[in-house]
Amino acid sequence: MAAHSSLYNEDRNLLRIREKERRNQEAHQEKEAFPEKAPLFPEPYKTAKGDELSSRIQTMLGDYEEMKEFLSSKSHPHRLDGSEDRPGKPRYPLGHDRGNGAASSSLRTHVYHQPIHTSAPGSRPVGNISHSPKMAQPRMEPSLHTKIYDGPRLTQDHLSQGHCSRKCDRRAEGDSAPERKLSPLISSLPSPVPPLSPVHSRLQGTSKAHSSGVSSKSCCVAKSSKDLVAKAQDKETPHDGLVAVTSLGSAPPQPPCQTFPPPPLPSKSAAMQQKPTAYVRPMDGQDQAPSESPELKLPLEDYGQQSFEKPDLKVPAKAKLTRLRMPSQSVEQPYSNEVHCVEEILKEMTHSWPPPLTAIHTPSTAEPSRFPFPTKDPLHVSPATQSQKQYDTPSKTHPNPQQGTSMLEDDLQLSDSEDSDTEQATEKPPSPPAPPSAPQTLPEPVASAHSSSGESESSESDSSSDSESESSSSDSEEEEENEPLETRAPEPEPPTTNKWQLDNWLTKVNQPSVPLDGRGSTESPQWRQESKGVAEGSSDQQHPDSKDPLPKSSSKTLRGPSEGPSLGRGAVRNPPLNRNPHLGKPWAANNPGNPPRLRPGRAQASSQAESEVGPLPYGSKEQTSKDRPKVKTKGRPRAVGSREPKPEVPAPTPQAAVPRPKPPVPTPSEKRKHKSSTAPSKAPSAPQPPKDSAGDRNPEHSALVSLTQSQGPSHSSRGSSGSVRTSGCRQAVIAQGDGCKDKLLLPLRDTKLLSPLRDSPPPTSLVVKITLDLLTRIPQPLGKGSRPRKAEDKQLSAGKKQDSETKSCDSSSRVTKKRKVTQKKSTVTRDTNWISRRASSSSSHTESSRTKAPRSSSENSRKEMLPPASASSVSSSSSSQKPSRPAQKRPRPDEDTCSQEPPRSASSTKSSSTDPPAPKHRKVQARGSEHKGSSGDAANAANPFPVPSLPNGNAKPGKPQVKSDRQQADFHMKEAKKLKCKAETMVDKAGKAFKYLEAVLSFIECGMASESESSAKSAYAVYSETIDLIRYVMSLKCFSDNTMPAQEKIFAVLCLRCQSLLNMAMFRCKKDTVMKYSRTLSEHFKSTSKVAQAPSPCTARSTGVPSPLSPMPSPASSVGSQSSAGSSMGSVGVTATVSTPVSIQNMTSSYVTITSHVLTAFSLWEQAEALTRKNKEFFAQLSTKVRVLALNSSLVDLVHYTRQGLQRLKQSPKGP
């Protein structure tokens, strides 16, 4: 392995040197494009808190200018030496090389970690980036750090070795010397450092590349001064850093302000480099990661070159690895530098490392060293991969390698103190302070990772704004290649700490889903590629880490899982964070706004877990996870519901949706983390099992990662997602979604799918459909019944439908709806059946009453109306076809008509004139009687023409029918008037006669349509006027002349038959009245039959005895009745009429007038028959074509018959 790594290292070193030179040139060009001195932010991102934070950071990290010079002078020579020595050493030394890599990575991590601190201060001052040296250094000095890298790196190596030795002692004491070096690094990394170490390594690599290209100038001067300052500050600032971090974390209430600035600074740096306004989004945290990416790319190139130059520095870092246990991050930085330097190396690493990752992943999961190694792997990976990573890393490209060197030293000291403090704090779980310290103090890995993600962004933004835009441009480019790989994984850890506080604020304020999307999408390729290197490197590192005490591996394993899910922050932060990430990330995903409490607790838990994991094996890690779950439980009460459905957490996944495509590669590690995260989310109350499972799964995940080393970029993507998460819990969720795409995404999608199903809109639509069906069915059955029934049924069905719809909506149960529908259908069916039965029964009853009424009426008419026996027979036949309704209405209308009609008749001698003024009741009855008398056929025939739809004339159509009848009546009346006017204008008598006859037919149709109208003009009056018109037409020519032509005779026959049938229609209209009068008069005559004298009626009247037969005194009874000489009854004793009841007189007159219509009809019919004999052929053909016309024929038949006859006449050669 060592030999293989050595070969890789040599090749990579060469590639790195070339790449660094190239990238330095590019970085310089790009830096020229971007003013170096241009302030990152027009205004300080933060005011009061930012100043306070920057002061603390300066105190912790030292003055930026001093550190810049110190680091540049220090890191540049070492980087050159390191790069030279490195080639000879295995690219991925199992023990020593890795230790060296870990040392440099830890240095980088510290540098990156410091950027986190500086990030907060840097965020407040735009121009402060240069003023707050330590804060700005992370971003501004990536190249400077790289320049000074070797010196600070060595010093940091010593520091980090001291720190790592402490952690390594805690974590594991049974590893080989190289492994011990690595293990201290790894152990320090696993605690807080591991996640950060990748970032640091990336920072260191960036610093190397940049220092080789840009910072080599001030390398020596800045090196010594800055190295000393960095060491002193690191030693002095560990507590200060911890304080600052703790203040950030301890101010969870203020996380938005304190925690937020660090992420914003990266975002700001990125914004300054890419978009000047992006700094505004630093509050979003990771939103601006993508913004940083462009500038980071430039630093990455420099970084790649510097990483080549830094092999010697890495070697010293190796020697000082024990100290650099925290600097194991710096070791990672060298690796990341190499990774960033050589894309080809990264590709090679990607290809070669997958198996090592499998072996290493499980043990080194807890160790951030694997991140540095993955960084190396990316270096081995082809330059294309490196450039891809570079490209992807721009947002992560942090010129922190140089800064990282000085800041790494500061951070190493801070990390040592912070780690101890973090461990204490984690143990304590002050969730507010812990999260800030978690990002910076808690896990140096976290701090490094945070620096890598958040700080990398912050420092990158700062550096892009100032000198870092020059030195960091090249370094960023190189680091972006290398760091992104490492930073991807470590980044998730910074997200853990910053994520807890900052993300809480960000989740509430700037839900980092956008940052995640932009950053994840922008960096996704970088992270994926880098994560390949990171995953491979991490697997290698994990392998040495696995050699290192189990605590390291456990912590790294935890990190691996957390990395895996691209929840990188939580996972990479610490092993506990990994556990926490499961809980915390889901929680963050579900409760982006609630993360503040939970995240602080988690950050502390992460620090504790990392501290504990360092000394503890997997078992202890599980314990730590248990403890951490407790911390999570604090924040988790909110997230329990949301975390448990972490698969459903996809709610935040919408934000993660974009990142998801990125994490497809990181799926294995994300799966691991997802598994652990899912377990905690499923068992929030039992976080320990999830964490245990996370720890147990970590090996599996490591294996998965090794298998998916090609998916390593996904790890880095997760890290990047984690860093994005730092800006918000949603980002963590997104990372998680990315990692868990296979597992988590499905739950998320399922959750989304479930929610739509819960909405249950289909039931409503079903209800609507059912309603439509019911409506269609209801009208049909109702059509059989009477219209009122239809309306009622419709109302019932509508009510039922509404009820059923309401119930179905309430229950949202299709079954219930179906049942209701069935009930509705059954009800509708029952209603329909009931309506049909009722209709049938009513029809049968009507028929029976009809038969009875006609019989009685016919008997009465026969008894009282002997003279018009024929008329009585006709009336009886017609009445037999008529309904009994008229009979039922007879009493009142008859009385009214009897009382009112006589006065009318007295006023006029014509019965026709008396009838029209009759009351409405009488008119209605007359209409009914007319229909009855006209025979069922006539009534039925009338229906086709807007005639009332009364087959027998017994039932009056409903209101709708009345309206249509009225419309039809008006229409026919207009047509009749038009034809009449035309006829009047015509000169030809024959043509005029024909036109008049056509008008007559229209009048007849109007009368038929008006029969159903009770309040409309009486059909009786229409028929009467029509008869008058026919008489006028007949008067135009003398049709009695035998010499008239056959056409005229035929025309005369048609006119006579029309008159005859119209008379019959008039009789039918008054039939009910006539029948009543007949009964009344017969009774009256019976009572007076004792008087044998003819004037008996008159005598009775003269006696003044009121007629007992009178049903009721008519209103007209009070009116003095005058004898009507013209009455058909022709009372003999006119003078005695005064004593005769007026009602009897009126009834007698009306009776005679109405019955006279029947007589007239017969007379006219006979005349027509006489004329027909002369033209039998014509009428025979007409009858054959239409139908035989008779006295009892309906008016409809008459109209049809007459029209056909007129048509034939017109068509005949002799026609008019």
UniProtKB/Swiss-Prot annotation:
Q: Which Pfam families match?
A: AF-4 (PF05110), AF4_int (PF18875), AFF4_CHD (PF18876)
Q: Name one GO cellular component term.
A: nucleus
Which InterPro entries does the entry mention? AF4/FMR2 (IPR007797), AF4/FMR2_CHD (IPR043640), AF4_int (IPR043639)
Question: Where located?
Answer: Nucleus
Q: Where is the composition biased (Basic and acidic residues)?
A: 9-35, 78-99, 166-182, 789-808
Which stretches does UniProt call biased (Pro residues)? 252-266, 429-438
**Sequence ranges of Polar residues compositional bias:** 383-406
Keywords, A to Z?
Answer: Acetylation, Nucleus, Phosphoprotein, Proto-oncogene
Has keyword Phosphoprotein? yes
Q: Supply one GO molecular-function term.
A: DNA-binding transcription factor activity
- Going by the entry's taxonomy, the superkingdom of the source organism is recorded as Eukaryota
In this UniProt entry, the residues modified to N6-acetyllysine are 682
Q: Where is this region: Disordered?
A: 1-52, 68-104, 116-139, 152-217, 244-275, 352-728, 777-969, 1094-1125
Q: What is its main location?
A: nucleus
Q: Which residues carry this modification: Phosphoserine?
A: 183, 191, 197, 755, 760
- Coiled-coil stretches are none
Residue stretches of biased makeup (Acidic residues): 408-424, 457-484
Q: Name one GO biological process term.
A: positive regulation of DNA-templated transcription
Q: Which portions of the chain have biased composition (kind: Low complexity)?
A: 207-217, 710-728, 824-846, 867-886, 902-915, 1115-1125
Oligomeric state and interaction partners are given as: Component of the super elongation complex (SEC), at least composed of EAF1, EAF2, CDK9, MLLT3/AF9, AFF (AFF1 or AFF4), the P-TEFb complex and ELL (ELL, ELL2 or ELL3).
Instruction: Tell me the protein family, please.
Output: Belongs to the AF4 family.
The entry's protein name is: AF4/FMR2 family member 1
Q: Which gene encodes it?
A: Aff1
